[in-house]
Amino acid sequence: MSGSTRTGSASVLLVGLSFRSAPVTMLEQATVADADLPKMQLSLVDNDVISESLVLSTCNRMEFYTVANAFHSGLDHVVDTIAQFSGLQTAELEPHLYVHYADSAAEHMLKVASGLDSMVIGEQQIIGQLRSAYQSANETGTVGRTLHDLTQRALRTGKRVHSETAIDSAGASMVSFALDQALRYIEPARALSAVVDDAPLSQPLAGHRALIIGAGAMASLASTHLGKLGIDHVTVANRTLSRAENLVNHARQAGVDASAVPLDGVTDCLSAVDIVVSATGAVGNVVTEQDVRAAVGAAGGVASVAGRRGTKVMIDLSMPADIEHSVAEIDGVKLLNIEELTTMAGDRVQDESPARAIVADELQSFLEQQRAQSVVPTVKALRQKAGEVMAEELMALERLTPDMSEADRAAVVKSMKRVVDKLLHTPTVQAKKLSAGGQQVSYPDALAALFNLPNGMVDSVTQPGQADSSAAQTAGTSARADQIPSAARVGRVVREA
């Protein structure tokens, strides 16, 4: 295979670990903190096998993109590095790792950037995460031409998919699906007031309160959908309070009563809400079992703040988990995490075919670009060789024509350069076209294609009689050269022939 992502004998090697291949606990342990990414990327290239590295670390995947000149030794080094930084044993990791090489690695990054490989299909956050991963690796100095080109193509592909298809609605579908499931566990608040009693069926959350933890895309979708379901009040908690306040402002503009609190204010809010939606993407639990038990106790068992008894629903849309798994064991609490929701959603997914068509189109374009670039070093070497031959011929000319005027000499040099440029221009262009196409051709066909020889020209010089004459002339030239013992005179014969 003429791998498009190959540079000389090197190819892109991807080793990954994601929600599809590994349990949550392993993903959480393998996650690399932002502060450690530069050190890890440098460790990946600290050998003779790998020349480039980029680590993509998100809430539900760890992917290690490298450029390796040998597959097996490159793979061993990447796996050993993952084990070193995660503290996991190689034997523990290997069953859960996936590997892509050359063109397959390029295709995978394009799919990831498009949201096609995400737990929530179509989520846009991955584009920013990939951009940040590239910037980190670039600043560390571990990104070269190959990973630069691949990442830029992936970012372009992701933007096209989100602007040209309806895949974004898939993320909204997951949030709405999660809240639809939550409605199964929340008792209608019909007896609270005349206003609630008259609330339309389309607003089943009238009289209820919600807490949203996080202020990203998923949190924003949750706020919007809660408003449509008639929620009375939304509290938004986030590490950066200004982002929480921005989301609150959007909610208020949509007619939803809302307020913002810092992330450390979450525990104080738990007892006053019926629904919790968490989507921070943080490493480590934001809400613990102890927090929830205290909140349930403060609310009088499973009684809500409004005085009615019902289930407190906690929706965890993060990976790694924001909400401690053992919360599910608390009476009166229903925990819905992203893994469970994905399984329950089943076929409720957006049509991915338009997005996949864009990925295929961008991949093909990228492969052609990379194949065309792969011939550049050879073209440069060819031009360098031609320059050396021309220089030798000019030196020989100077020895043979010491009386030639400077004007004539300059004219000869200019003429020779023109001849070399004209001879090499067509094969340079054709070589890039042939490489981009990726088709296999015979040596004679390749030579004819490189020099763009007209159809029939090769046949015309190999007609019966002409071929014999050509062969005889070639043999004669070789014989004359063989008869000249001096190496210095060989060049003269070639010049005179």
Swiss-Prot record:
Residues 461-486 are annotated as: Disordered. GO terms for molecular function: glutamyl-tRNA reductase activity; NADP binding. The active site is at 59 (nucleophile). Substrate binds at residues 58-61, 118, 123-125, 129. Keywords: NADP, Oxidoreductase, Porphyrin biosynthesis. The keyword Amino-acid biosynthesis does not apply. Belongs to the glutamyl-tRNA reductase family. Catalyzes the NADPH-dependent reduction of glutamyl-tRNA(Glu) to glutamate 1-semialdehyde (GSA). NCBIfam families: hemA (TIGR01035), PRK00045.1-3 (NF000744). During catalysis, the active site Cys acts as a nucleophile attacking the alpha-carbonyl group of tRNA-bound glutamate with the formation of a thioester intermediate between enzyme and glutamate, and the concomitant release of tRNA(Glu). The thioester intermediate is finally reduced by direct hydride transfer from NADPH, to form the product GSA. This is Glutamyl-tRNA reductase. It comes from Corynebacterium jeikeium (strain K411).
